[in-house]
């Protein structure tokens, strides 16, 4: 007997023209739509096939839904796939010219000048198509972020003019063979630099109707899910990813020039160590044990320094099983480096030099603008020297009370004091209320908010920094600094703890915090402790979030804008795939941009 509580499974049927599996209801709709289209084509079968008729067809396509457009276009391209002479997905097209170079080299051509002696072969995507009668078609082609007009005249065509152009639509990737020139319009003074095409080759058709340039593609949710379409329509993400690449390139160049060695360390570990964070857990079938995706590469990098690689760095992914918000992603990119015989004072000087010179190199100056989610606009001055704030004195000034000495901040009495401070200052802290978490919450409220221009925050208690070396002068404090910009953390560094006895005690304290319910506390890593027993030289360690710096230098308050493919929540659309309503625009001459 069937289970009355069971969910009835939807039966999907094959839609042969598109190769999709759809519901019975959807299939009926499509068959009916095709029957109407077939009847329309039958009536028009005797009409001569002229480019004006195709233009009318393109205008009709403006009224189609996204699915209808896809179906008609797919059918047309499938027919081309069956032919031998005009296969729409050729293996090769020889490109001899970069579009950016073309615009630079030929920008000074005179009005009406045509260089028929200069062969040009470029490729790009069609953004607009404008038809002017049977013998003239204009295209705007884009590649590598730049645009050029392509002028196609029947008199210049080396192959069938109508056959070349009637199949092309907005979004298609095409190869252009022609020569450079400047148009000679009657109503304009200078004309427009163009490629006068002798042949246009379809290299890869776009089966979907693109959003028009007029309405654009601005929905953030869809832009992140369809980053390829975002890049096709919008130029800003291209510039963001180029800036990100420049940041990574500059970091490598800077460190390589200072005799650092780039290394790679494991992404999966038996113990989640190197940072205070919640890890992702995976399982290795052959080893029959759980592994942790790394939260930081720190411990491995320091073991390499123990082995004699005195200057090492790694640029790579980290994974933290924590909340997703405007500034945090579960998968993110960092740069960490470790330098033997350096301390946190050396690293502060190096940080100022590295970041300020990088900003100057990438942006051309030391000042950038950053707009927060609330619309507050900051002007950030990256030029050194940077401001420095001592954590505990700053908290005492903000709270109006004397805090316990650094070597007493881990005690139960200090815990009681911190709870009173939270209550007095009306600050909420989520459990577990460990001393480290409460102090960190107060710092976030009253110290970090003062950091607009790049600011060093120093004087962290040892209980907040299990891998940092104790301060040489102040008990209970460690030699650590963080850099904050517009109230957000950018990087973290310290003089590394190289005392194996002290390190083991710190790990045990972290284990106690984990027992109290702090999931982010670190576990004891015996392998790392053993490595320290062989001797780690005095070392400075440094780590920076590349995503966060990219946000600052590209003026983006959301981390998803600087990630090519950010982590997204499930799309909750029910039933059939949502049909996007694609708005198409019309050119000034009345031709439809498809």
Curated annotation (Swiss-Prot):
InterPro entries, sorted: Aa-tRNA-synt_II, aa-tRNA-synth_II, aa-tRNA-synth_II/BPL/LPL, Lys-tRNA-ligase_II, Lys-tRNA-ligase_II_bac/euk, Lys-tRNA-ligase_II_N, Lys-tRNA-synth_II_C, NA-bd_OB-fold
GO process terms (BP): lysyl-tRNA aminoacylation
Keywords: Aminoacyl-tRNA synthetase, ATP-binding, Ligase, Nucleotide-binding, Protein biosynthesis
Segments for region (Disordered): 1-62
Record's catalysed reaction(s): tRNA(Lys) + L-lysine + ATP = L-lysyl-tRNA(Lys) + AMP + diphosphate
Basic and acidic residues composition bias: residue spans: 18-42
Subunit structure, interactors included: Homodimer.
Family per record: Belongs to the class-II aminoacyl-tRNA synthetase family.
Cited function: Involved in self-resistance to cladosporin since this product is an inhibitor of lysyl-tRNA synthetase. Cla4 may not be inhibited by cladosporin, thereby imparting cladosporin resistance. When cladosporin biosynthesis is switched on, transcription of cla4 will then be necessary for continued protein synthesis in C.cladosporioides.
Name recorded for this polypeptide: Lysine--tRNA ligase cla4
Source organism: Cladosporium cladosporioides
């Amino acid at each position: 007997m069937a289970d009355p509580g069971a969910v009835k499974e939807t039966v999907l049927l094959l839609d042969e023209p598109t190769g999709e599996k759809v519901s019975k209801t959807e299939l009926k709709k499509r068959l009916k739509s095709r029957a109407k289209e077939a009847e329309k084509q039958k009536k028009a079968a005797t009409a001569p096939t002229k480019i004006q008729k195709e233009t009318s067809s393109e205008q009709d396509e403006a009224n189609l839904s996204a699915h209808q457009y896809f179906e008609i276009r797919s059918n047309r391209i499938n027919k081309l796939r069956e032919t031998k002479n005009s296969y729409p997905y050729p293996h090769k097209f020889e490109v001899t010219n970069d579009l950016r170079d073309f615009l630079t080299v030929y920008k000074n051509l005179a009005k009406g000048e045509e260089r028929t002696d200069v062969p040009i072969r470029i490729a790009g995507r069609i953004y607009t198509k404008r038809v002017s009668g049977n013998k003239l078609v204009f295209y705007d082609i884009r590649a590598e972020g730049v645009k050029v007009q392509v002028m196609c005249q029947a008199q210049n065509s080396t192959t069938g003019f109508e056959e070349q152009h009637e199949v092309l639509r907005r979004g298609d990737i095409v190869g252009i063979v022609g020569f450079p020139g400047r148009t000679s319009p009657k109503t304009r003074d200078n004309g427009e630099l163009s490629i006068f095409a002798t042949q246009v080759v379809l290299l890869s058709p776009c089966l979907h109707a693109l959003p028009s340039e007029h309405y654009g593609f601005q929905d953030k949710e869809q832009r992140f899910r369809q980053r390829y379409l975002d890049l096709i329509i919008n130029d800003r993400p291209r510039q963001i990813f180029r800036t990100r690449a420049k940041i990574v390139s500059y970091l490598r160049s800077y460190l390589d020039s200072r005799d650092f060695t780039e290394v790679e360390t494991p992404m999966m570990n038996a113990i989640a160590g190197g940072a205070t964070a919640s890890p992702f857990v995976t399982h290795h079938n052959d080893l029959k044990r759980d592994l942790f995706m790394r939260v930081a590469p720190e411990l491995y990098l320091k073991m390499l320094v123990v082995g004699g690689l005195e200057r090492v760095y790694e640029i790579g992914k980290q994974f933290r099983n924590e909340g997703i918000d405007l500034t945090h992603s579960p998968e993110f990119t960092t740069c960490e480096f470790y330098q033997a015989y350096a301390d946190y004072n050396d690293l502060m000087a190096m940080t100022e030099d590295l970041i300020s010179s990088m900003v100057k190199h990438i942006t051309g100056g030391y000042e950038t603008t950053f707009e927060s989610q609330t619309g507050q606009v900051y002007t950030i001055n990256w030029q050194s020297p940077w401001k420095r704030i001592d954590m505990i004195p700053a908290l005492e000034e903000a709270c109006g009370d004397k805090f316990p000495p650094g070597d007493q901040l881990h005690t139960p009495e200090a815990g009681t004091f911190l709870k009173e401070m939270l209550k007095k200052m009306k600050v909420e802290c989520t459990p577990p209320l460990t001393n480290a978490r409460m102090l960190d919450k107060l710092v976030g409220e009253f110290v970090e908010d003062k950091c607009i221009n790049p600011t060093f925050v120093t004087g962290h208690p040892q209980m907040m920094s299990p891998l940092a070396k104790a301060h040489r002068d102040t008990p209970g404090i460690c030699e650590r600094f963080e850099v904050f910009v517009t109230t957000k953390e950018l990087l973290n560094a310290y003089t590394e703890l190289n005392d194996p006895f002290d390190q083991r005690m710190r790990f045990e304290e972290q284990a106690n915090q984990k027992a109290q319910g702090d999931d982010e506390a670190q576990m004891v890593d015996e392998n790392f402790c053993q490595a320290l027993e062989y001797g780690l030289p005095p070392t400075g360690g440094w780590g920076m979030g590349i995503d966060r710096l990219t946000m600052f230098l590209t003026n983006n308050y959301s981390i998803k804008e600087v990630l090519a493919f950010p982590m997204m929540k499930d799309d909750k659309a029910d039933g059939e795939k949502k049909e996007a309503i694609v708005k198409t625009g019309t050119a000034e001459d009345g031709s439809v941009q498809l």
